[in-house]
Amino acid sequence: MRINPTTSGSGVSTLEKKNPGRVVQIIGPVLDVAFPPGKMPNIYNALVVQGRDSVGQPINVACEVQQLLGNNRVRAIAMSATEGLTRGMEVIDTGAPISVPVGGATLGRIFNVLGEPVDNLGPVDTSTTSPIHRSAPAFIQLDTKLSIFETGIEVVDLLAPYRRGGKIGLFGGAGVGKTVLIMELINNIAKAHGGVSVFGGVGERTREGNDLYMEMKESGVINEENIAESKVALVYGQMNEPPGARMRVGLTALTMAEYFRDVNEQDVLLFIDNIFRFVQAGSEVSALLGRMPSAVGYQPTLSTEMGSLQERITSTKEGSITSIQAVYVPADDLTDPAPATTFAHLDATTVLSRGLAAKGIYPAVDPLDSTSTMLQPRIVGEEHYETAQRVKQTLQRYKELQDIIAILGLDELSEEDRLLVARARKIERFLSQPFFVAEVFTGSPGKYVGLAETIRGFQLILSGELDGLPEQAFYLVGNIDEATAKAMNLEMESNLKK
């Protein structure tokens, strides 16, 4: 699908005086606006309220039309705070949906829902913009070939591989390495696939958004010296913003990603943190618009809203958008309508484990809880599938034996089980990997491990060829040859100490 970009400015900041209306009612972030007969705006059109507040400060509030009420009135939802607005203020219909800048000019910059830069680094080139509301690619444009999206991260590629153009749910609490994993994926897609990334911060903490930006600058994902060489564009609509902004910021990020896919023909990574906040914002807007709530108080249009976002995230014949979405599960209830609706769209889940993080095994991806629809022999091949299954079986058996080991000790196990435990511990450590973006913290150079190398390494451990090597040799290394070399170094060091 090709975009037909407009050449107007981003958001709704530059306007002609066309089709003016008047504010007739304000209820929080919801505005009712009256227009002259025969000049009603379309649904999703951007409106701008312009004027001055009681102390003479200029007001410029963007809204989006949600309902046509009759009697020449529309109901719109504000994208920014409505403090200072009064009845009778002039409202301008822009005649089009919210449009945001797209293309290379967005890389290394932070935007709000309207596509306006919020990082104090000056204006952005707005010669090419695109509306945030678009239809999903037509069937004929889709790339239906099932292919693996190689990340260079062993535990992901082997046990829960990502689909090119697929959607992945990322589950993890605070402090288990979610941000570092996200940054490594951004780094690897740029190096291995020549792709770029778009990060959509939907309804999360402003502090976390700031921390992510600072860490990206520190790790080189955002290049301060030459912004154009950055690998990511950031779009934030944080939890202090009105529900309208939080509901639409995901679409703004997606629109930027679509341009890289359709026009630049690149592989794009789209991060959404957090997809639950998108649903939550939609629920707030639905209540403000007076719709009858559905199950558990959610909006009746929940599935439609989720589908309209998720169906645009796909592979076309030009390129792909692979989406990684952090999923918050309210009260750990997986049957809650918000996560349940999200699960229907996911191709893989990556679960981060606090237990593994406590052991110092990073990335702390749980190899048994993480799943993928791609892990089938006809897609990944027999060799990959068999290796992954044997790794999972070994780790599952080790998990079952841990209670016995804790009570009776390793000596009480059979010879066969002792061997299995030793191999499982090697596998657990070999699933750790030094990251490029964590070099500044760990001092270990980052490693990108190809899928073939990953499979070969785990096959050697499972076959017993490396039973004689110490388990610490497998910790934080790249491929299996590095583990062998590390074992030799450890042996030499221990001999020198003697």
UniProtKB/Swiss-Prot annotation:
Enzyme class, UniProt record, top EC level: translocase
CDD domains: ATP-synt_F1_beta_C, ATP-synt_F1_beta_N, F1-ATPase_beta_CD
Similarity remark: Belongs to the ATPase alpha/beta chains family.
Subunit record text: F-type ATPases have 2 components, CF(1) - the catalytic core - and CF(0) - the membrane proton channel. CF(1) has five subunits: alpha(3), beta(3), gamma(1), delta(1), epsilon(1). CF(0) has four main subunits: a(1), b(1), b'(1) and c(9-12).
Binding site for ATP: 172-179
EC assignment: 7.1.2.2
GO cellular component: chloroplast thylakoid membrane; proton-transporting ATP synthase complex
Catalysed reactions, semicolon-separated: ATP + H2O + 4 H(+)(in) = ADP + phosphate + 5 H(+)(out)
Gene responsible for this protein: atpB
Annotated keywords: ATP synthesis, ATP-binding, CF(1), Chloroplast, Hydrogen ion transport, Ion transport, Membrane, Nucleotide-binding, Plastid, Thylakoid, Translocase, Transport
Record organism: Nicotiana tabacum (Common tobacco)
GO MF term list: ATP binding; ATP hydrolysis activity; proton-transporting ATP synthase activity, rotational mechanism
Membrane-topology annotation of the record: Peripheral membrane protein
PANTHER family attached to this UniProt entry: ATP SYNTHASE, ATP SYNTHASE SUBUNIT BETA, MITOCHONDRIAL
HAMAP family xref list: ATP_synth_beta_bact
UniProt superkingdom: Eukaryota
Lineage, opening ranks: Eukaryota, Viridiplantae, Streptophyta, Embryophyta, Tracheophyta
Alphabetized SMART domains for the sequence: AAA (SM00382)
Localization terms from the record: Plastid, Chloroplast thylakoid membrane
Name of the molecule in the record: ATP synthase subunit beta, chloroplastic
Function per UniProt: Produces ATP from ADP in the presence of a proton gradient across the membrane. The catalytic sites are hosted primarily by the beta subunits.
